[in-house]
């Protein structure tokens, strides 16, 4: 446990960041699941709409450092390929 004032402050800040990141990660995963569900249902219009929503979210999370930029690119590429295959 933190023994001095600055270490206690850093622990509090780290916990705030962890909660904030967990919220953002959950939101990102929710939109990804909606896209996957639309693709699985075979509804190209809904899948395209969901993809249009999830793309900027993935880009934003990669820019903020929540996920790696290659992970965002991989998800976008796979979603795009799956939608085109419908």
From Swiss-Prot:
Source organism, top-level taxon: Bacteria
Q: Which GO terms describe its biological process?
A: translation
Give positions of region: Disordered. Answer: 1-27
Return the Gene3D superfamilies for the record.
Ribosomal protein S20 (1.20.58.110)
What are the GO cellular component annotations?
A: cytosol; small ribosomal subunit
**ATP-binding: is it a keyword of this entry?**
no
The alphabetical list of record keywords is: Ribonucleoprotein, Ribosomal protein, RNA-binding, rRNA-binding
GO molecular function terms attached to this record: small ribosomal subunit rRNA binding; structural constituent of ribosome
Q: What does this protein do?
A: Binds directly to 16S ribosomal RNA.
The Swiss-Prot or TrEMBL record describes its family as follows: Belongs to the bacterial ribosomal protein bS20 family.
What name does UniProt use for this protein? Small ribosomal subunit protein bS20
Q: Which species does the entry assign this protein to?
A: Vibrio cholerae serotype O1 (strain ATCC 39315 / El Tor Inaba N16961)
């Amino acid at each position: 446990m933190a023994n001095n004032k600055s270490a206690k402050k850093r622990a509090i800040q780290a916990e705030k960041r962890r909660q904030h990141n967990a919220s953002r990660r959950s939101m990102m995963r929710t939109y990804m699941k909606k896209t996957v569900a639309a693709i699985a249902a075979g509804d190209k219009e809904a899948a395209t709409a969901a993809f249009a929503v999830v793309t900027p979210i993935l880009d934003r999370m990669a820019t903020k450092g929540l996920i790696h930029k290659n992970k965002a690119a991989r998800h976008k590429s796979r979603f795009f390929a799956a939608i085109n295959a419908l």
